[in-house]
């Protein structure tokens, strides 16, 4: 079970790497993906600062370095950054590639991420759902903006 939890913990990073690999030869989508991934992260931090909803009490750590990372803005759990980043990647990659095989793999990794964050008491179900929805919206908006304003490949 530890390997599944570890995959869940690193799910957003795994999905980011998958996106970079898949989009490497499609420059406008590659650069857009990386740029908007950063914007998605910034949106998450701004929402956490604005909403200020704390994480659940007594969250468990999967990695030793986790003990000190839930301070400052990271003490807040709304919306879940893991869920938001995962669903940003899923949405962006699906809209660009429309490949059901990639979608299934990405959804599997994102499901492990959602499960890990919930089972380790790092987020409530509401924080995970809102994070997922924000990620979908940012992913969709990113591809829409790129398709509208960046016409060269």
Language-model region placement:
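Short, charged/polar low-complexity linear motifs in solvent-exposed/disordered segments
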Residues: 98, 105-106, 144, 149-151
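Charge-rich, low-complexity amphipathic helices
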Residues: 25-29, 69, 133, 147, ...
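Hydrophobic alpha-helical bundle signature of multipass membrane enzymes
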Residues: 1-78, 84-119
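Membrane-interfacial segments
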Residues: 50-55, 59, 124, 145-153
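Alpha-helical transmembrane segments that form the membrane-embedded catalytic/substrate-binding core
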Residues: 82-86, 123-147
């Amino acid at each position: 079970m530890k390997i599944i939890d570890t995959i869940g913990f690193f799910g957003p990073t795994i999905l980011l790497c998958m996106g970079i690999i898949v989009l490497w030869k499609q420059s406008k989508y590659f650069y857009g993906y990386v740029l908007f991934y950063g914007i998605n992260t910034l949106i998450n931090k701004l929402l956490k600062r604005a909403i200020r909803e704390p994480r659940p009490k007594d969250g468990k750590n999967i990695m030793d370095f986790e003990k000190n990372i839930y301070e400052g803005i990271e003490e807040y759990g709304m919306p879940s950054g893991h869920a938001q980043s995962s669903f940003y990647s899923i949405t962006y990659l699906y809209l660009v590639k429309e490949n059901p095989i990639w979608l299934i793999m990405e959804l599997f990794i994102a499901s492990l991420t959602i499960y890990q964050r919930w089972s380790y008491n790092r987020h409530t179900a509401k924080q995970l759902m809102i994070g997922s929805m924000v990620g979908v919206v940012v992913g969709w908006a990113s591809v829409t903006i790129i398709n509208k304003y960046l016409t060269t490949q």
